């Protein structure tokens, strides 16, 4: 996240995640799927709804060179793993640590199904590192 989605929203960096894990504190990430940043919108036009971020918001919050590179790697790995990028994005959060419990807010059957499919994806440490760092 480049800038907060809304005032008071914060992002959890690696240092803070390490602190939480070492102190056995659970993390409940709010925007675990980056509000659709990992969906190829032109392939799913019928699932676009009013709660989706505007392009302006998406650019402000998520578009950076690092994030766009991560998105590209997510699409590449999703193809190799035969899943969708949005499923892989959630699987990434789930697979990071057993103390992370991502919150999701599906608004239609497509979103619900993608969340359930993410539970089937077991990522290796190498795949997690690839998604984060390349």
PLM features: what roles do these ranges have?
Residues 1-133:
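Beta/alpha (TIM)-barrel catalytic core signal, keyed to glycine-rich beta->alpha loops juxtaposed to Asp/Glu
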């Amino acid at each position: 996240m480049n800038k907060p989605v809304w005032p008071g929203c914060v992002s959890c960096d690696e240092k803070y995640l390490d602190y939480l894990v070492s102190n056995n504190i659970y993390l409940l990430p709010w925007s675990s799927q980056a509000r659709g940043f990992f969906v190829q919108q032109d392939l799913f036009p019928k699932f676009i709804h009013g709660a989706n971020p505007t392009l302006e918001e998406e650019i402000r919050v998520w578009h950076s060179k690092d994030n766009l590179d991560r998105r590209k790697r997510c699409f590449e790995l999703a193809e190799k793993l035969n899943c969708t990028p949005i499923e892989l994005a959630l699987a990434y959060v789930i697979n990071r640590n057993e103390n992370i419990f991502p919150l999701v807010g599906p608004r239609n059957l497509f979103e619900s199904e993608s969340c359930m499919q993410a539970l089937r994806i077991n990522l290796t440490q190498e795949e997690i590192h690839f998604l984060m760092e390349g």
